[in-house]
């Protein structure tokens, strides 16, 4: 893992970003008034409505940016995920308990090891500002790691993530428990080659939320975002 310098302005950036989004919230909408009407009818009562796609990404640029600027690789990938997902309208709708909700903002759920040897969770608000996202990411992950208290945003659409970096993985299929319908991405350790670094990423989503075409568009946008990230 890379050593990350402490950023003294983290709390200020965190408060500023939170204040911009605190008044936005989710609302229930009529599925028949959306482009998900048919999918909602077909898949909300399905015993297994989740779909998983796996794509191998070229993360060479992320690896170089991480090493060159001393930024966490996982943070950079989470920022790219949020930036790509925010361009897909379907990400802002989510079925839950037989209803469809629309959200005004998005956050990336990050898992961190805590001081008690367990796991803690935090939701990092999505923003186009990489510096602000990095500051919030570091502040929140450090806080939950030390306090063992989750910091979650119930009013944002949450894109779950899980980095299983203890080994290289070809694909990850997450459990479906019928409670969490949120889109979810997971990956293992990246693979460093002579000319490029690659990383298979698995993307799980609820079929009532989006179709395969939307998911494919997101994965393509994620690769473009990775290729063009600038610091």
Question: What positions do the PLM features span?
Answer:
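Small-residue-rich loop/turn and linker elements
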Residues: 91-123, 155
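Histidine-centered acyl-transfer/condensation active-site motif
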Residues: 154-168, 183-220
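Helical lid/core segments from catalytic subdomains that handle acyl or acyl-like groups
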Residues: 114-169
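N-terminal beta-alpha "docking/capping" segments at the starts of catalytic domains
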Residues: 26-72
